[in-house]
């Protein structure tokens, strides 16, 4: 599995960059924000999400870990694929997007190409609680993703996250949350 690329940017378009790494050129899907920061002929370091489908092997590239985490979370929402997730990241930084979700600005989300009212509402509902505004945020986001990957619902997870002590390590928080969810 490819998780990162360090190489020279060979070619850039709005949503794709070609990165040459030791004689091999990789086509990487990127947001418009990322493509604007890349320069042809310059060295780049991208965090990669590799998606393997029946008909395609895709590489998505990100300059920031926060973009990659948000992209992965968006892909878990039914109706959101790579194209729409990249459109969101092209329109908003992760912090701007977090603010839109926190303030429930459905209309702003609908301005993203490919997102109508129904999908905007679904994204809002699915991401409520994913962004937490306090010092335990990084730990809570990791716990949220771990529990969600185990099949727990967002509402259940959010309820448990509110009860966790802020000083717990991520592993301890996951264990505590699992105990609460299974009782």
From Swiss-Prot:
Residue segments, region Flexible linker: 141
Keyword terms of this UniProt record: Cytoplasm, DNA damage, DNA recombination, DNA repair, DNA-binding
InterPro entries the UniProt entry points to: DNA_helicase_Holl-junc_RuvA_I, Hlx-hairpin-Hlx_DNA-bd_motif, NA-bd_OB-fold, RuvA, RuvA_2-like, RuvA_C, RuvA_C_sf
Region Domain III, annotated ranges: 141-183
Chain positions covered by the region annotation Domain II: 64-141
Origin superkingdom: Bacteria
Residue numbers spanned by region Domain I: 1-63
Domain notes: Has three domains with a flexible linker between the domains II and III and assumes an 'L' shape. Domain III is highly mobile and contacts RuvB.
HAMAP family to which the protein is assigned, alphabetical: DNA_HJ_migration_RuvA
Listed name of the protein: Holliday junction branch migration complex subunit RuvA
């Amino acid at each position: 599995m490819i998780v990162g690329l360090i190489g020279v940017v060979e070619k850039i378009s709005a949503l794709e960059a070609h990165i040459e790494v030791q004689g091999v050129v990789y086509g990487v899907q990127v947001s418009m924000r990322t493509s604007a920061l890349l320069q042809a002929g310059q060295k780049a370091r991208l965090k990669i999400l590799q998606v393997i489908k029946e008909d395609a092997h895709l590489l998505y590239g990100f300059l920031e870990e926060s973009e990659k985490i948000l992209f992965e979370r968006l892909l878990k929402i039914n109706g959101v694929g790579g194209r729409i997730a990249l459109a969101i990241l092209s329109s908003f930084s992760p912090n701007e997007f977090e603010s839109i979700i926190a303030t429930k600005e459905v209309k702003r989300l609908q301005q993203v190409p490919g997102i109508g009212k129904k999908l905007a509402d679904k994204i809002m509902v699915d991401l409520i609680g994913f962004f937490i505004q306090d010092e335990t945020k990084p730990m809570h986001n990791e716990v949220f993703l771990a529990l969600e990957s185990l099949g727990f619902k967002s509402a259940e997870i959010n309820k448990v996250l509110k009860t966790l002590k802020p000083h717990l390590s991520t592993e301890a928080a996951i264990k505590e949350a699992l105990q609460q969810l299974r009782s």
